[in-house]
Design a protein with these regions (language model features):
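Substrate-binding/catalytic cleft of secreted carbohydrate-active enzymes
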Residues: 1-210
Length: 210
């Protein structure tokens, strides 16, 4: 997953050659405006047309975590915008799945993706097993977010945890990551194993991306 950027075609060429699978993504607009809608749509259509013939691309992902559509949970015009992007993408490519807003507050989507940076494996596993029915609704599932925007229902799509982990090392103040920082590579491997094992045990989870 080349996160929130459009890759140089040389990168995609070598992914074709080496057999690496890629999610094709897009940089976010800063906020929702008429101008952002026009420019985003134009640029995204160019991206799809330009990269359509790269077999390495397995899904189109134009938006992430409601960036650029920050009120999508309840605001109809932002929901309609994501629907328009979904169907425009489908009009150019009927084969690949489209994940319009990766992570949460989905409207129309071929895959339901969730982001969760929980650092304790047992907590992560229990969240997605004990509260499955609540998660796949418009109820909040984690960090104040819901899997679906208001007015939308889960329709049996595959479910992927497309962001998790993000473990930071305690090496300096500029280290980036989530949760408590680890001090050694052994600590990193232990936590990575703990949360990854938990994700793999979730019975309805079809895939994951660290």
């Amino acid at each position: 997953r080349k996160h929130q950027k459009t890759e140089d075609e040389r990168f995609l060429y070598w992914c074709d050659v080496k057999g690496m699978l890629v999610w094709s993504e897009m940089a976010a607009a800063y906020c929702y405006t008429d101008y952002a809608v026009e420019e985003f749509t134009k640029e995204w259509m160019e991206i799809v047309r330009q990269n359509y013939n790269h077999p390495c691309i397995i899904t189109w992902t134009p938006m992430n975590e409601s960036w650029g559509v920050s009120q999508i949970e309840t605001r109809k015009v932002e929901q309609h915008f994501t629907e328009a992007v979904y169907y425009l993408t489908k009009s150019l490519d009927t084969m690949r799945p489209v994940i319009v807003n990766d992570g949460w507050e989905h409207t129309v989507s071929d895959i339901i993706t969730l982001h969760d940076y929980e650092e304790v494996g047992d907590t992560l596993y229990k969240r997605y097993t004990e509260y499955k029915d609540q998660i796949l609704t418009t109820e909040v599932y984690h960090s104040g977010k819901s899997a679906l925007a208001n007015g939308y229902e889960y329709k049996g799509q595959p479910i992927i945890i497309s962001e998790y982990g993000g473990i930071a090392f305690n090496n300096d103040d500029s280290g980036w990551g989530y949760g408590n920082k680890v001090n050694t590579k052994e600590d990193f491997i232990k936590r990575f194993d703990d949360i990854t094992t938990a994700v793999k045990k979730i019975p309805y989870c079809c895939g994951f991306c660290y």
